[in-house]
Amino acid sequence: MVGEAIPANGAKPHITVRDLTMAFGSFVLMRDLNFTVNHGDVFIIMGGSGSGKSTLLRHMIGLIEPAKGDIFYGDENFTKAEPAKRQELLRRMGVLFQTGGLWSSMTLAENIGMLLEEYTGLSPTEIREVASLKLALVGLKGFEDYYPSQISGGMQKRAGLARAMALDPEVLFFDEPSAGLDPISSRLLDELILELRDSLGATVVVVTHELASIFTIGNNSVFLDPETKTMTASGHPKELLAHCSDPTVRAFLRRETVSESLQDSG
């Protein structure tokens, strides 16, 4: 299961990562990454601490340039795209970072509205209506005029998700969405991610180390191994749990030590 994930059931590739190397100067973090995210996937980027999960996400949205390799969205080479084409591709993406990405000095509606004001020709009334709709989609109807400090951490994450959806993205990226949430709020956020994937027809990419989320929402994944500095497995998380022979992957998915995983496989 090492190498590029194969599209299942005729699914079309949405994102293709090809021969990607991530490095900071002479220090190589990950090399030779090859995988495909298919349309409609909830794709999990997983791995141990220091494996570069969040760094990979930042490469995929253009915040960091690769030392080598390319990232494609459909047939478009995002890595080598001209600035105008890259901006066009970026408008098709929504991102929820760990903190939620909300401006504390703005209301929830204003947080969403600033993107609509910058990238659309909507009137102030229309912007308010769209902001209200996005908040309603994440269960925050009636919270338009609340400030982030006035709502809970779980609600802030949902408001951040509403902001990420402001421009109707084709791809949603989540960086450790469950960070700082209690188990109930985390489960509710997982359910919301699946609901939005289904209702919006979006592709979802999630960085997480939470096994509950990995097995609940993920249908495709890649495992980054900091020891070998490359990907050591890809595919459906439940299939990897059942059949992957790599001891590090097995240990991660079973919450075992590597030595325990080797004993189990022996």
Write out the residue ranges for each language-model feature.
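Catalytic Walker B motif of ABC-type/P-loop ATPase nucleotide-binding domains
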Residues: 172-175
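A short, proline-enriched helix->beta-strand linker immediately N-terminal to the Walker B motif
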Residues: 166-170
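Conserved ABC ATPase "signature" region
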Residues: 124-143
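Conserved ABC ATPase signature
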Residues: 147-151, 155
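Helix-to-loop junction immediately C-terminal to a conserved catalytic motif
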Residues: 61
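Conserved ABC transporter NBD signature motif
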Residues: 69-78
